[in-house]
Amino acid sequence: MLQTHLQETREQVSRLEKIVQQSVGKLEPKRSKPMAALIDEARELVDDAKNDPVRDVIILTACQRIEYYEIAVYSAVCNFAEIIGETEQFGLLKKTLEQENNANEALRGLADSANTRADRAA
């Protein structure tokens, strides 16, 4: 599941680059501070995990938190593109938003199983 989403993410980057080129030309990439904070926190929690099942839950929870953040951002820019009449950009962003929602659903299923395993290991 994570490998599939990694490939989707690469496609999303290409779509975003296309949108940026159409809108403003060239844009210098910047590191997202909120995303970096989510990743840093996840690393700390993984390092403190007491066993593998708990570590799995932490990783899946971190992935879901990242998905929630991405869904919020893509929802906002998707809505904005629709409001200002950018039909092509709206379509590209909507596809990305759908992929993020699908990834979140898949993570939810994995998290349910991981939580059960962690509970048994406790």
Regions from the language model: what does each represent?
Residues 1-122:
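Amphipathic alpha-helical hairpins
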